[in-house]
Design a protein with these regions (language model features):
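HIT superfamily nucleotide-processing domains
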Residues: 1-130
Length: 130
């Protein structure tokens, strides 16, 4: 799991399969079970730590197919959504699109200190909830 560089939605992460796999149907039964556990853990963390009302999960493989010889690698995006603004280090981040689909071109500028705060708080949750 990686914290996305783009924090257009506070806590936005990407889950990446450790081995190469080109699509969801390629997951083993054990990987499906592990994915479910991880989805539950991450979503609970985002709700508990930052107050997310819900999380949108997506497996977007389109970018790989821009290449002449596509070689997709399974990864899943999580975009937490917030009914109430997120407060980080005194800065307020409202989710002005709450209740609507996410914007493809939304800017996610947050300060380096706030990005670090998101990373630390989410990492602490993930390590505590093993």
């Amino acid at each position: 799991m990686f914290l996305s560089d783009e924090q257009d939605y506070i806590g936005r992460c990407i889950l990446v399969l450790k081995r190469h796999c080109g699509s969801l149907p390629g997951l083993t039964d054990g990987e499906w079970k592990d994915l479910r556990k991880l989805v539950c853990k991450v979503e609970n963390g985002l709700k508990t730590v930052f107050g997310a009302a819900l999380c949108n999960w997506s497996c977007l493989m389109n970018g790989f197919y821009k290449e002449a010889e596509p070689n997709p690698h399974l990864h899943i995006h999580v975009r937490p959504r917030y009914a109430k603004p997120v407060l980080l280090n005194g800065n307020v981040y409202p989710d002005g699109e709450f209740g609507h689909h996410y914007a493809v071109k939304k800017s996610g500028t947050i300060s380096d200190a706030d990005r670090r705060e998101v990373f630390v708080r989410l990492k602490e949750w993930m390590e505590r909830e093993k």
